A protein has these predicted regions:
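Terminal-appendage/accessory-domain detector
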Residues: 1-100, 200-210, 217-455
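Secretory-pathway/luminal and periplasmic proteins that interact with or process carbohydrate-rich
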Residues: 59-62, 132-141, 186-194, 305-307
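Hydrophobic alpha-helical hairpins/lids featuring a short glycine-rich hinge
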Residues: 83, 87-140
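Active-site nucleophile and cofactor-binding loops and adjacent substrate-binding regions
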Residues: 96-103, 121-126, 144-158, 203-205, ...
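Amphipathic alpha-helical interface segments
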Residues: 101-105, 147-168, 178-247
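Alpha-helix C-terminal capping segments
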Residues: 109-116, 164-172, 335-338
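Structural helix-adjacent loops and short alpha-helical linkers that scaffold large soluble proteins
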Residues: 114-126, 170-177, 225-228
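Short, well-structured alpha-helical segments that form the helix of a local strand-helix-strand
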Residues: 126, 130, 177-180, 431-434
Length: 455
């Protein structure tokens, strides 16, 4: 009997770059653009610096570049640093309740450089990496992973990135299955960083990226992994005691996850996005000033409440950048004052601003009964806003800018890239990097891109 891992491996090993539709290739390039943008913006964050210092100390062969720097190291260690950097500001994509780009794209870029892979094949690795991660996340319901304390980004992402790494190494279906089995031994990461804003939140995608390359290379060397790693008696499906075979296999090879990506407009937890867009739009349309806000109530799913509304004392008065990014009260308050919730709004020197904290105290997040059975990825919220002059507004917000049903345009993606990349590299290199990514499928190798974003 064919196992779930074997089904994925057979498909992934046989992906033909030339057979991918232009729309799929374009979607993958958008994912690369966003991941590189986030990595460059996050390159100087303290948690990235710490991971980089440890990686440098390993004394590994210099085969892959660290984004935004002149450093080179082994592909696994470069993926560790770059994955941490992509996720350093919580500004990276978030499809299927997983930050897939932070795990898959550092692997594709690192191995693409180290193995001198043609860019079209690297793009195909991105496509299949997103697919494998998404299908596993959907099959076991990533929302249940959150509720049980697991971090879906690293738990599921290591499999997609391992499939991408195996593909770039040219492994056959049987060996790719072993790579997935080995990746299952590395599938880990938990949500306890929510308790005190610990840096491990940023690290876990990078660790999954590192481990995925190791899994593929161990399989390449002949190490075996369980073929039933997903659906076996002790497999990954047991993490949530659920499986959705229909979602796991539906449209394999015709429906592509890179075309269903949730791109972030705000440098804040994705669970905050509908309310952020809704409140900012409402304030603009009704000409409401921050000082006129009497109270805001936001009803969300139970799992969303646990991430962005609790514990209330931390969400109202965040102590770290991560505390603030995971806080709906803080995110809404700073956005109402500044008109946006970008990187600067979550800087440490903003966290004690009495104007922000005063507004945050007027924002209440609760579990809405109508969302009790909402599935992962459903970030619908109910918004009630009362003003000091007696006005009351009620809205049901189902989507946000960057959602697949309201996607950011290429121009918006480009603007985000330029804002982020300019924090690390000069303007002419920003333009060169952008041009290289948008034309990635036409390049002979990765050198034009790497020249712009490293060194």
């Amino acid at each position: 009997m064919t196992t779930a891992a074997e089904s994925l491996a057979t498909w992934a090993a046989g992906v033909d770059p030339a057979a991918l539709a232009p729309s799929v290739v374009h979607a993958a390039k958008r994912c690369v653009l966003d991941a590189v943008a986030c990595a460059l913006a996050g390159a100087d964050m303290p948690w990235v610096e710490r991971v980089l210092a440890v990686a440098r100390a390993q004394g590994s062969p210099s085969r892959a570049s660290v984004l935004g720097r002149a450093s080179r190291m082994s592909a696994p260690l470069a993926a560790l640093v770059n994955g941490t950097a992509v996720h350093a500001l919580d500004y990276d994509d978030d499809p299927a309740a997983c930050h897939i780009g932070a795990v898959v794209i550092p692997v594709a870029l690192g191995l693409g450089q180290a193995l001198r892979i043609a860019p079209p094949r690297m793009i195909a690795a991105v496509v299949l990496g997103y697919d494998v991660t998404t299908r596993i996340g959907e099959a076991i319901d990533a929302d249940l992973l959150y509720q049980k304390g697991y971090h879906p980004t690293s738990v599921c992402g290591v499999f997609g990135a391992a499939a991408a790494a195996a593909y770039l190494h040219g492994l056959d279906a049987a060996t790719t299955t072993h790579a997935l089995g080995i990746a299952g031994s590395f599938s880990s990461g938990n949500m306890e960083f929510l308790a005190d804003g610990a840096m491990t939140k940023r690290l876990q995608p990078g660790k999954a990226a590192h481990d995925s390359i190791l899994a593929a290379e161990l399989a390449h060397a002949g190490l075996t992994g369980p073929r039933s790693i997903l659906d076996g008696r002790y497999g990954v499906w047991r993490y949530t005691e659920t499986r959705d075979d229909a979602r796991f296999t539906h449209g394999l090879g015709t429906r592509f996850a890179v075309q269903e990506v949730y791109v972030k407009k705000h440098a804040s937890c994705l669970g905050n996005a509908p309310a952020l867009d809704g409140v900012l739009d409402l304030m603009h349309a009704q000409r409401i000033a921050p000082a006129q806000i009497r109270e805001i109530r936001v009803g969300v799913r139970v799992s969303t409440l646990a991430m962005v509304g609790e514990p209330r004392e931390i969400r109202e008065r965040p102590q770290t950048m991560l505390d603030a990014q995971m806080s709906l009260p803080y995110s809404l308050a700073v956005a109402m004052l500044d008109g946006e919730a970008g990187i600067a709004q979550f800087a440490p020197d903003r966290l004690g601003d009495p104007r922000i904290l005063g507004l945050a105290e007027r924002i209440h997040v609760y579990a809405h009964p109508d969302l009790a059975t909402a599935k992962a990825g459903n970030l619908t919220c109910y918004l009630d806003l009362d003003t000091t002059d007696g006005r009351h507004f009620t809205e049901r917000l189902e989507t946000y800018r960057g959602h697949p049903r309201s996607p950011m345009t290429d121009e918006e993606m480009e603007a985000k890239f330029r804002r982020c990349a300019s924090l690390r590299i000069a303007a002419e290199r920003v333009s060169a990097a952008s041009e290289a990514i948008w034309n990635l499928d036409k390049l002979a190798d990765l050198s034009p891109l790497l020249a712009a974003i490293t060194g």
